């Protein structure tokens, strides 16, 4: 009959286990006046009674407490599982929040480093452009002044030639000599202008070449700085992520 009562549960426990949990006292007496357990099925499976109703005679405790213990044990196990699941869910949510914070901090650092790099690059390019414009303006002013000086000297030479031609119109030899001298002077002036022009072109080419070298060097430095910056950010990010993972694992384990 006791086995029939135990079959009502999906996972019945051995009768010896229930009997071990019953407190020691008087043995079951036939004079107790209580009917057998088979005549009281409702009392054996009445799980809604309080613990006070289960604290009767020792014989009632031995007959009625076994199924009640099974039910309460299952309820406590389900509650413990729910508590553990809630704690795991809270730890996972906290872990996800830490990862999101780390990713946001990483993104802010990358944006800050990128803005700083672009700002420094723009400043360098503006400085190079300003230097180039100043050098070109300086060369223009310098060679313009030299051209003006040569032109003024040329005009003075022509004026002298005309004056001397008028004065020495009657003296052919002297006029021829002066003409030859004037041609020589003009050739020298033309040669000087040609040299100045060639120097001007060469100076412009040198300036452009230097600027190209400066741009190339600046670009190489920028690439190196960006590579170093990327490596630094990746190392910091890995360290931060490892620290977060270690912290989360410690909080989960301890």
Curated annotation (Swiss-Prot):
Any Pfam family hit: Cor1
Principal location listed in the UniProt entry: nucleus
Gene Ontology terms for molecular function: DNA binding
Description of the deletion phenotype: Homozygous males with null mutations have smaller testes and are sterile, due to massive apoptotic cell death of male germ cells during meiotic prophase. Spermatocytes fail to form axial/lateral elements and synaptonemal complexes, and the chromosomes in the mutant spermatocytes do not synapse. In contrast, females are fertile and generate healthy offspring. However, they exhibit a sharp reduction in litter size that increases with advancing maternal age. In contrast to wild-type, a high percentage of the mutant embryos display aneuploidy.
Segments forming a coiled coil: 84-241
Post-translational modification: Phosphorylated.
GO cellular component: chromosome; chromosome, centromeric region; condensed chromosome; condensed chromosome, centromeric region; condensed nuclear chromosome; female germ cell nucleus; lateral element; male germ cell nucleus
Biased composition (Basic and acidic residues): 40-55
Region (Disordered): 1-65
PTM-bearing positions, type Phosphoserine: 8, 10-11, 55, 57, 77
InterPro entries documented for this protein: XLR/SYCP3 (IPR051443), XLR/SYCP3/FAM9_dom (IPR006888)
Phosphothreonine, modified sites: 218
Spans annotated as Interaction with DNA: 71-76, 106-109
Highest taxon in the source lineage: Eukaryota
Motif (Nuclear localization signal): 106-109
Expression by tissue: Detected in oocytes. Detected in spermatocytes and testis (at protein level).
UniProtKB keywords: Cell cycle, Cell division, Centromere, Chromosome, Coiled coil, DNA-binding, Meiosis, Nucleus, Phosphoprotein
One of the GO biological process terms: sperm DNA condensation
Important for oligomerization and fiber formation: annotated segments: 87-92, 249-254
Subunit structure: Component of the lateral elements of synaptonemal complexes. Homotetramer; the tetrameric helix bundles assemble end to end into long homopolimeric fibers that exhibit a transversal striation with a periodicity of about 20 nm (in vitro). Interacts with SYCP2. Forms a complex with EWSR1, PRDM9, REC8 and SYCP1; complex formation is dependent of phosphorylated form of REC8 and requires PRDM9 bound to hotspot DNA; EWSR1 joins PRDM9 with the chromosomal axis through REC8.
Biological role stated in the UniProt entry: Component of the synaptonemal complexes (SCS), formed between homologous chromosomes during meiotic prophase. Required for centromere pairing during meiosis in male germ cells. Required for normal meiosis during spermatogenesis and male fertility. Plays a lesser role in female fertility. Required for efficient phosphorylation of HORMAD1 and HORMAD2.
PANTHER family xrefs: SYNAPTONEMAL COMPLEX PROTEIN 3, XLR/SCP3/FAM9
Family label: Belongs to the XLR/SYCP3 family.
Domain notes: Composed of a long central coiled coil domain. The N-terminal and C-terminal regions interact with DNA.
Protein name: Synaptonemal complex protein 3
Organism: Mus musculus (Mouse)
Lineage start: Eukaryota, Metazoa, Chordata, Craniata, Vertebrata
